[in-house]
Amino acid sequence: YGQDIVEELAKYAGVPVWNGLTNEFHPTQMLADMLTIREHLGHLKGVKFVYMGDARYNMGNSLMVTCAKLGMDFVACTSRKYFPNEELVDYCKKVAAETGASIALTEDVAEGTKDADVIYTDVWVSMGEPDEVWAERLQDLMPYQVNKAAMANAKPTAIFMHCLPCLLYTSPSPRDSG
């Protein structure tokens, strides 16, 4: 899943190489997600997009970059230890300054989800991580689950998204779960 492998392949392939998914980025998912958001909301510019969970890896990174480039307001709502890489955050803030987007990081769920247009989450344990991290992640990220309270704090028209596969749900909709 290494980004370096895709970059090396692209360097020597002699043909275009598309990054379907690496540990750092997931551009294929971005195309699908942005089309879905546009389909449901009618636009992308100015959309408040909240990512809840572990924002350090491919989904958090890709969503932050994509939102910055498309003029969307990105919020990583998670524990500080799961904030995205500072260097990438700085890059995204520079891009956001040119597109009218904004980039915010918060540990406060009420602040982060307030008036959100989109609330998005991902698996809490990423591909290739050892089983030993499960207990810590569940403890750390449980306050950042997308549930009824988080969705109620968003706009009434807000949509919930997940890049799949999603596991451990007790309800088919976050609007129904506690």
Regions found by a protein language model. Give the residues of each.
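Phosphate/diphosphate ligand-binding glycine-rich loop within oxidoreductases
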Residues: Y1-R38, L168
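Glycine-rich phosphate/diphosphate-binding loop of Rossmann-like nucleotide-binding domains
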Residues: K45-A104
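Structural alpha-helical scaffold elements that stabilize or flank donor/cofactor-binding regions
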Residues: E111-G112
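An anion/phosphate-binding loop that grips the pyrophosphate of nucleotide cofactors and donors
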Residues: A116
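Glycine/threonine-rich flexible loop motifs
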Residues: S126-Y144
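Short, conserved loop/helix-junction motifs that constitute active-site signature segments
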Residues: A150-T157
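Conserved small/polar residues in nucleotide/adenosyl-binding loops
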Residues: Y169-D176
